[in-house]
Regions:
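Feature detects long, helix-prone N-terminal segments enriched in hydrophobes
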Residues: 1-119
């Protein structure tokens, strides 16, 4: 799992993304007395893409989608899995700047995950 997180961070970094934080969901749940399998949520931020949404009053409502996230988790079979929002699909629900930004993010995620995720 750690290797997968590192590979995602490295691939994302090559495209200009930073990782502001990784949430340890297993640890968070344990602090509440709940046991779950390992699960982490990595936040990815591309400053230039986020800026396009944040600078526009018309598009700022989409900041709830920022930063973009990737979940890396284990299942009972012991294998590591990765999931993320389909930003390319989400872009079809949008207009203007948000549509283009999320289309770009979707394309970036395809590139980031290539070679990391097996179909």
């Amino acid at each position: 799992m750690e290797e997968t997180l590192e590979r995602i961070q490295n691939a994302a970094g090559e495209l200009g993304y930073t990782v502001p934080i990784v949430h340890d969901m297993q640890g968070n749940m344990a602090r509440n007395g709940i046991e779950v399998l390992p699960a982490q949520i990595m936040e990815l931020c591309h400053g230039a893409r986020a800026y396009e949404i944040l600078k526009s009053d018309k598009d700022r409502y989409n900041q709830a989608m920022l930063p973009c996230r990737v979940a890396v988790y284990e299942k009972e079979d012991g294998k590591t899995y990765v999931s993320w929002t389909n930003y390319a699909h989400f872009s079809q629900l949008e207009h203007g700047i948000s549509m283009e930004v999320f289309r770009q993010v979707g394309s970036d995620y395809d590139e980031i995950m290539q070679g990391i995720v097996k179909e």
